[in-house]
Amino acid sequence: MDMIEHKQVRDLKLKKNSQSDYTQIYIGLDFGTAFTKASYEIASQKHNISSVKFHDTEATDKYFMPSKLYFDDETKTLSMEKTSGALSEIKYFKYTMIDNSLAINENLYKYKDEVKNNLEQLCAMFFLSRVILKIKKAVTENPIIKNSKINSEVEWFINMGVPILETGEKSEIYKTVLTVAYQYAMKHPQGINANLVELDNFFEEKQGRCKS
């Protein structure tokens, strides 16, 4: 399994001080077929790796985010949660996003002519955007960050393991999806739902910049 990296500097102010520099955060993202896990390290705290807790529970599965979404056929909306029995489950997009022959989410494909981009990539982009927000929340709530005495911008490095070679078209798909997911998270930091067409428009706008 190879790694792809996304790097982005965000203006996240911590404590007011005359000093200003960067706090570097290294994120390890395991985008799994069934579950997603994440951990991070603050560069100034070497060998102190923290796992991201995705759920407010003491159960052992609090570190595992199910890699699935739910789709509302009527509103064409993706959701992180199943809010009604009418929503269909969307899963396995980690692999189907790079190979159309593996596509199994039939409810999505009724709308393939209404979007310009691969439907499974849109699912992965939205899912990863919500995961990134949960990771960033965990980082900013870390006492080391909260109690920092510097006025710092946070420089984020995300390493995501993918089941492909580091180079090639499929690697570029994962890189683009991860990068656009980060951008979408910053643009839309609230909510667990997203309209499929709106996601498509955002992805269409941003992916060209990723490739340029």
Regions found by a protein language model. Name each.
Residues S44-E172:
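Phosphate-binding loop and its immediate beta->loop->alpha context
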Residues K15-H47, L87, S212:
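Gly/Thr-rich phosphate-binding beta-strand-loop-beta motif of the actin/hexokinase/Hsp70
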Residues V154, E166-K211:
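Glycine-rich phosphate-binding loop and adjoining helix at the ATP-binding site
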Residues M1-K15, E41-E58:
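Von Willebrand factor
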Residues F31-A34, E41, E74, P163-L165, ...:
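An acidic- and aromatic-residue-enriched active-site/binding cleft used to recognize and process polar
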Residues D2-Q24, Q190-S212:
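Conserved phosphate-binding catalytic cores of ATP/NTP-utilizing and phosphoryl-transfer enzymes
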Residues K37, I132, K175-T179:
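Short, well-ordered alpha-helical packing segments
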